[in-house]
C-alpha cells in the first residue's frame, strides 16, 4: 500500500478547530498564538470555501469557543460547532455529519488544544477512519511546551502530517494564478506582521 503524500485541495479538505475555549485562556502555553493562527486559517478557509468544524469540550464547565474565533465565522462558508465529552473530536455525531455532508472529505486540518490530549486522540481516530490528518504545529498547544512537542512527534509516528499554517495556506492555493490568491495574500501578510509585532504569538519551535 502506497502511503499518502498528503497533498491537499480545498474541495476535499476541512478545518477542525479543537476546543479553543475561554476557560483555557490562562492555562495553555501561548494560548494567544493558537487563537491568532487559527483566526488567519479561518479567514483563508472562508475565502476558499473550506468547511470549518469547531468542537467544544464540556462547554458547561469550560466555556464556549473563544469569542475572537466565533467572530471570524462567515455566512458564505459552512461552519458547525459540536459539543462533546469525549476527548477526541472524532465522535459519532461528527463522523455522521462528515458522511452526510462531506462525502468527498479526504484531508483534515487541525488546530487547537491540548496537543497531547484532544488533538492527539482526534488525530489517531481520524487516521483510523481513513482520513489524512494535517497538524498545524504553530496552531496547537498544551499546558506546557514539552507535552506539545512530544505529542507532535507521537502523531508523526502514527502517520499524521506535521506542518505549519503558512505551508497549508499555500498548499490550498497552489498557484499564483488561483482566483483567490489576491484575497489571500493580504491575510498572509497581516499574519506575518502580527508575528513580527508580537513574537510571543509564535509557536514555531518544534
Swiss-Prot record:
Domain of life: Eukaryota
Protein known as: Isochorismatase family protein 1B
SUPFAM superfamilies per UniProt: Isochorismatase-like hydrolases (SSF52499)
Similarity section: Belongs to the isochorismatase family.
InterPro entries in the record: Isochorismatase-like_dom, Isochorismatase-like_sf, Isochorismatase_domain
Pfam families associated with the record: Isochorismatase
Disulfide bonds: none
Amino acid at each position: 500500500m502506497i502511503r499518502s503524500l498528503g497533498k491537499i485541495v480545498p474541495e476535499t479538505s476541512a478545518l477542525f478547530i479543537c476546543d479553543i475555549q475561554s476557560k483555557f485562556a490562562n492555562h495553555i502555553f501561548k494560548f494567544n498564538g493558537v487563537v491568532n493562527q487559527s483566526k488567519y486559517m479561518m479567514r483563508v478557509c472562508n475565502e476558499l470555501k473550506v468547511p470549518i468544524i469547531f468542537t467544544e469540550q464540556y462547554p458547561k464547565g469550560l466555556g464556549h469557543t473563544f469569542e475572537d474565533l466565533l467572530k471570524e465565522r462567515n455566512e458564505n462558508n459552512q461552519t458547525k460547532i459540536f459539543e462533546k465529552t469525549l476527548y477526541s473530536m472524532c465522535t459519532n455525531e461528527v463522523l455522521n455529519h462528515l458522511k452526510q455532508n462531506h462525502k468527498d472529505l479526504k484531508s483534515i486540518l487541525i488546530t487547537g488544544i491540548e496537543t497531547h490530549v484532544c488533538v492527539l486522540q482526534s488525530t489517531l481516530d481520524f487516521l483510523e477512519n481513513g482520513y489524512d490528518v494535517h497538524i498545524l504545529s504553530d496552531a496547537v498547544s498544551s499546558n506546557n511546551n514539552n507535552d506539545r512537542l512530544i505529542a507532535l512527534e507521537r502523531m508523526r509516528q502514527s502517520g499524521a502530517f506535521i506542518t505549519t499554517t503558512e505551508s497549508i495556506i499555500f498548499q490550498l492555493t497552489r498557484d499564483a494564478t488561483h482566483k483567490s490568491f489576491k484575497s489571500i495574500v493580504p491575510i498572509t501578510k497581516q499574519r506575518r506582521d502580527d508575528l513580527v509585532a508580537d513574537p510571543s504569538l509564535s509557536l514555531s519551535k518544534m
